[in-house]
Amino acid sequence: MKITLLSTAYPYRGGIAVFTERLARAFQQEGDKVNISTFSLQYPNFLFPGKSQYASSERPSDLDITAEVNSINPFNWFRIGRKIKKQKPDILILKYWIPFMAPCLGTISRIVKRNKHTKVIVVVDNIIPHEKRFGDNFLSKYFVNSVDGFVAMSKSVYDDLILFDAKKCILGVHPLYDNF
């Protein structure tokens, strides 16, 4: 199968990047052709609460990672959407963890699905954020309506997801990491 992952990955650090890279390797071990499309800009610096968004480690040599998605530039979303649409992966796997990403990921998903071939599946860490903000439900609803299915990483997220769309969701409990 031809699989595109659109998620946080190197040069970014953190649990989502580790998960994405590990998932890509698992698909590769099964014989699938995998590429990762990650962010050229994930968050503007003033929105990032930590010390640094970036990894201090070496670039993974066994993964095809392209930093190209700008989370706040709609022109970029259309360009990336058209690019992935043209590549026609069998599956586009998105990672969703915060409604801030809904306009970007939802727009890209809608464009890709126009190729009538690619299925868009989302691995969800949170659909309703811990720190709720005005507009979160609207943004998440926009995103939910753009994809074919969800894998919730916990029972509580599954319960939140079925409030948006019970038909598209399965529970796949978060795996233990084997990279430590």
Locate predicted features.
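An aromatic- and histidine-rich active-site surface loop
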Residues: 74-80, 92-116
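N-terminal strand-loop element at the rim of the active site
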Residues: 7-13, 25-86, 157, 162
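A short, glycine/small-residue-rich beta-strand->loop->alpha-helix junction that serves as a flexible
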Residues: 7-22, 97-102, 131
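Donor nucleotide-sugar binding/catalytic pocket of nucleotide-sugar-dependent glycosyltransferases
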Residues: 145-180
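Extreme N-terminal starter segment of soluble prokaryotic enzymes
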Residues: 1-4
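Proline-aspartate-enriched helix->loop->beta-strand connector
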Residues: 88-90
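Nucleotide-sugar donor phosphate/pyrophosphate-binding loop at the beta->alpha transition
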Residues: 116-121, 127-146, 155, 178
